[in-house]
């Protein structure tokens, strides 16, 4: 099924889009605008002939192309004439009804008629179809009403034997009664007679004459040849004179008739003898086919009433139109604009246009048509208002996207440039809108969801947040009561440093872990599995040093029971208080283990009393807290402590579902040189198996292997079981949630999303200085920076060291941890330190050979530590070295002026007596007069009995002079002092 748009059909017919839409509306075909698509059925409805019986008798249809139907008449000339005569009487009966409203047109048309100059226009049309006048008169009188129904059809029918003769008559009949018709026909006949004189006239007339449809078929291929254009050109200068009159007639149509096309559209008149393609073949030709006997003289070109409306359809359907339509299709519909422009040009300039010029001006004609389509002009005033509204609405439809396209999906943030691209506007417009909101932005400036929504609303768009909802994806599934099974308790040992936490755990595990810790203090979280009487207990050992607060907080969060270790000889200490607070914040029950009871100065009662301040009251004293007195060294009461742990676990009724994907917590993580990133994972629910995909923080991976705290390989880890997992793509942070995933793609997507969010938050922290901040910085003096790179053996230690260093920052000096990671010191770290003037701190790690050589070459300070105390102290000293030293005044002594002498070349010299301290040469001195400072400067000379001396002690006399000052008087006091440098302190 072929589909043709309204504007294409209008171009083929050579009429205005509005007029075609009006015809379609009259034919019952509803179209919204000139871009609407017409089906074949719509075109047939539009082109339905007024005299259907004649169509059936006289024509046969042949489909030449999907979009072209060629109708050919079966009858010969005599048949056409007889059909014409037959239709005339019927038309004559109806003519009187229409004649009255169209008399006005007749009167208007008759005024220009005497001007013979205008008649060649008709002559051109008639020239193609010289017909006996007697036949025309009755036809003209007969056809007005029959032709009217066919008028709305923009598509002219191919040659119709019966209908074609009737149509030309229709044009003439509305014009006026027969008397008006006669004068018109006579000049036409005269011109007709003169036309053959031209050499090309016979060639043109013969095909158009078309007394039989067969002739019309023969002439069809010739329609596209230049001879047609030359025939048009042969119309002499009289055309210009008639053209304006015709235009006026077009504009002043009778109220009952549809408005004529604007003057720029004379293509319809010109079509019979030009290259102008006929409209779609299926349409009726209200004006009749050219060449019908007796019809041509009445073609309403000269007649006013006829020239208004009916005149237009006549040229739309010349007999030879179908071939031209084919040519038009092949040539991109250029012939139609060419012919019409040619005629318009003749009308304006008064000179016949050559065939070549017609083609040259086709582009202008196209532009003219576009103006009529898109810009309602003064000639559209007479049209129905609804068509103009359609045109205005059409502009809005073209410029405003559909509602579904006005929704922009973003993932939490979007750059200005990307937002502008998606909205189809310029980025500068968005930047201008942001500036109005007080935001100075560039094209790459990221916009958050709220700002983007605010901006998009101003431009008529909506923003939809399609960010990945990680929390929803990782949300734990609720467990049914029957799926929950009993699990071992997770116990965390907490307390102050050196109170015996690790020793107690070693005694329980019968191992010697503390021997492996540097300085005898724990600097890692350790996870261990202990079995007592067939029951398992999982222990987490946390550091007690103040720097490991985060580790203790993590330990308290993932645990079920906390064992608070307090030394009986030391009592409650700062980290003991902190451990109690962490446990209470996590809502975890506390069992107090009073350690070192074997020491002579042990005082368990004192410990119980101190802990009462924190609400930990012993059961012996009527409280609810379990206290157990133990000795890790002597292994006293260890079993009693474990029994209390199991008892507390039974009270808590600890249960978990092992038949689900594993979830847990990263207890500790490190970078192993042989195995890569390794993390200690405490499984809290579900079962972790080898081969499972997982995500932990910004890292993901697949479980390659697992082993327990004793180094044994494990294939599956159930709830409350700590295991070392190998298979991470990076070293995760301690405390990250570990979640087993169904596939690697989902795990990777979540990890990448978290990585992007982390990067955005880090960028937000490093904001640029504003002018006000910069001014304050200048006023106070530039802040000193000490950059550091921290490397450690495990993630927890690195985190603790970095946090301790950050706490050393002051207003005067700021410590920046540029990079903190797990693993040995590499060349990359040295290069970073060299570029940023940073020092490298290694905690329980050593530099690689190449890295050490590079550090020595670049002069990078690499410091290695095993104990966190030493690292913090060294950094503190380094920071103090960056501080500006302060100066302190040191008092030396006083001397009183007893006499003043004038010495040539030396100026005034004061004979003085040292009353206090000592006077030192080259020291700073103040001259006091009545306890007021008169002068402060440097001592010029110091002599005793004409000898220069370094200093003069109390009770001795001396001579002194000041540099560049001679106003000395008896009784003045010299106060001697010096300025000492004092190193800055944090």
Curated annotation (Swiss-Prot):
Entries under InterPro entries matching the protein: EF-G-like_DII, IF2_II, IF2_N, P-loop_NTPase, Small_GTP-bd, T_Tr_GTP-bd_dom, TF_IF2_bacterial-like, TIF_IF2
PROSITE patterns documented for this protein: G_TR_2, IF2
Region of interest called G4, as start-end residue ranges on this chain: 595-598
Spans annotated as G1: 495-502
A GO term for molecular function: GTP binding
A GO cellular-component term linked to this record: cytosol
Similarity section: Belongs to the TRAFAC class translation factor GTPase superfamily. Classic translation factor GTPase family. IF-2 subfamily.
Source species: Citrifermentans bemidjiense (strain ATCC BAA-1014 / DSM 16622 / JCM 12645 / Bem)
Protein name: Translation initiation factor IF-2
The entry's keywords: Cytoplasm, GTP-binding, Initiation factor, Nucleotide-binding, Protein biosynthesis
Highest taxon, organism lineage: Bacteria
SUPFAM superfamilies, A to Z: Initiation factor IF2/eIF5b, domain 3, P-loop containing nucleoside triphosphate hydrolases, Translation proteins
Keyword rRNA processing: no
Region described as G5: 631-633
């Amino acid at each position: 099924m072929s589909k043709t748009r309204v504007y294409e059909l209008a171009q083929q017919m050579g009429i205005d889009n509005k007029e075609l839409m009006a015809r379609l509306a009259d034919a019952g075909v509803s179209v919204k605008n000139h871009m609407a698509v017409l089906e074949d059925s719509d075109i047939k409805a539009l082109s339905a002939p007024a005299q259907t019986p004649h169509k059936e008798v006289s024509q046969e249809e042949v489909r030449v192309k999907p979009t072209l139907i060629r109708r050919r008449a079966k009858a010969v000339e005599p048949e056409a004439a007889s059909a014409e005569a037959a239709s005339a009487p019927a038309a004559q009966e109806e003519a009187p009804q229409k004649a009255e409203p169209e008399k006005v047109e007749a009167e208007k048309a008759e005024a220009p008629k005497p001007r013979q100059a205008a008649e060649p226009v008709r002559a051109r049309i008639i020239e193609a179809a010289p017909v006996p006048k007697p036949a025309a008169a009755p036809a003209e009188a007969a056809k007005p009403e029959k032709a009217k129904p066919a008028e709305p059809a923009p598509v002219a029918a191919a040659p119709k034997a019966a209908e074609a003769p009737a149509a030309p008559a229709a044009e003439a009949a509305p014009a006026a009664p027969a008397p008006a018709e006669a004068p018109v026909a006579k000049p036409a006949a005269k011109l007709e007679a003169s036309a053959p004189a031209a050499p090309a006239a016979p060639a043109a007339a013969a095909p158009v004459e078309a007394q039989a449809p067969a002739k019309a078929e023969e002439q069809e291929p010739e329609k596209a040849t230049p001879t047609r254009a030359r025939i048009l050109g042969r119309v002499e200068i009289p055309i210009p004179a008639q053209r304006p009159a015709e235009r006026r007639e077009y504009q002043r149509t009778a109220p009952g008739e549809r408005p004529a096309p604007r003057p720029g559209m004379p293509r319809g008149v010109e079509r019979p003898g030009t290259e102008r393609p006929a409209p779609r073949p299926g349409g009726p030709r209200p004006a009749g086919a050219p060449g019908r006997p007796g019809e041509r003289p009445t073609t309403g070109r000269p007649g006013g009433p006829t020239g208004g409306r009916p005149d237009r359809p006549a040229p739309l359907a010349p007999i030879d139109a179908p071939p031209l339509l084919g040519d038009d299709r092949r040539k991109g519909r250029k012939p139609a604009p060419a012919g019409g422009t040619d005629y318009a040009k003749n009308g304006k300039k008064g000179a016949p246009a050559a065939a070549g010029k017609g083609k040259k001006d086709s582009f202008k004609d196209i532009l003219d048509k576009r103006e009529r389509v898109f810009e309602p002009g003064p000639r559209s005033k007479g049209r129905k208002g609804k068509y103009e509204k359609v045109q205005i609405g059409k502009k809005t439809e073209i410029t405003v996207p559909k509602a579904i396209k006005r929704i922009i999906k973003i993932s939490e943030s979007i750059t200005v440039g990307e937002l502008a691209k998606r909205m189809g506007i310029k980025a500068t417009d968005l930047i201008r809108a942001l500036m109005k909101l007080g935001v100075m932005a560039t094209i790459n400036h990221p916009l958050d969801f709220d700002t983007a929504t605010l901006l998009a609303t101003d431009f008529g768009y909506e923003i939809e947040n399609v960010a990945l909802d990680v929390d929803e994806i990782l949300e734990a599934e609720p467990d049914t009561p029957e799926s929950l099974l009993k699990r071992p308790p997770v116990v965390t040992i907490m307390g102050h440093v050196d109170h015996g936490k690790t020793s107690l755990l070693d005694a329980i595990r019968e191992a010697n872990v503390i021997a492996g810790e540097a300085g005898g203090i724990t600097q890692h979280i350790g996870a261990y599995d202990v079995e007592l009487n067939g029951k398992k207990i999982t222990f987490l050992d946390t550091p007690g040093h103040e720097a490991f607060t985060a580790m203790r907080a993590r330990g308290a969060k993932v645990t079920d029971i906390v064992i608070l270790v307090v030394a009986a000889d030391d009592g409650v200490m700062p980290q003991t208080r902190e451990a109690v607070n962490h446990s209470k914040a996590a809502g975890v029950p506390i069992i107090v283990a009073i350690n070192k009871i074997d020491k002579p100065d042990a005082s368990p009662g004192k410990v119980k009393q101190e802990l009462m301040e924190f609400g930990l009251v012993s059961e012996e004293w009527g409280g609810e807290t379990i206290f157990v007195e133990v000795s890790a060294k002597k292994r006293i009461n260890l079993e009693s402590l474990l029994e209390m742990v199991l008892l507390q676990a039974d009270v808590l009724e600890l249960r978990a579902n092992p038949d689900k994907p594993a979830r847990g917590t990263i207890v500790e993580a490190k970078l192993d040189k042989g195995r890569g990133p390794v993390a200690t994972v405490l499984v809290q629910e579900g079962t972790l198996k080898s081969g499972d995909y997982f995500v932990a923080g910004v890292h993901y991976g697949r479980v390659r292997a697992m082993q327990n705290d004793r180094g044994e390989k494990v294939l599956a880890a159930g709830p409350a079981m700590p295991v070392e997992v190998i298979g991470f793509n990076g070293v995760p942070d301690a405390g990250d949630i570990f979640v087993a995933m169904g596939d690697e793609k989902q795990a990777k997507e979540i990890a990448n999303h978290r990585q992007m969010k982390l990067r955005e938050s880090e960028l937000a922290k490093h904001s640029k200085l504003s002018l006000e901040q910069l001014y304050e910085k200048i006023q106070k003096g530039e802040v000193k920076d000490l950059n550091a790179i921290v490397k450690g053996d495990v993630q927890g230690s690195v985190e603790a060291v970095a946090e301790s260093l950050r706490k050393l920052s002051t207003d005067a000096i700021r410590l920046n941890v540029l990079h903190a990671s797990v693993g040995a010191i590499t060349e990359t770290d040295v290069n970073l330190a060299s570029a940023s003037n940073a020092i490298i701190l290694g905690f329980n790690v050593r530099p690689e050979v190449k890295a050490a050589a590079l550090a020595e070459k670049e002069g990078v300070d690499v410091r290695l530590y095993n104990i966190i105390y030493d690292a913090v102290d060294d950094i503190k000293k380094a920071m103090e070295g960056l501080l500006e030293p302060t100066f302190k005044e040191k008092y030396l002594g006083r001397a009183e002026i007893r006499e003043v002498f004038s010495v040539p070349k030396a100026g005034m010299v004061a004979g003085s007596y040292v009353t206090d301290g000592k006077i030192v040469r080259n020291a700073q001195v103040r001259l006091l007069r009545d306890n007021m400072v008169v002068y402060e400067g440097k001592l010029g000379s110091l002599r005793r009995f004409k000898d220069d001396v370094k200093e003069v002690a109390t009770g001795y006399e001396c001579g002194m002079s000041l540099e560049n000052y001679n106003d000395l008087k008896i009784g003045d006091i010299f106060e001697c002092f010096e300025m000492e440098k004092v190193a800055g302190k944090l």
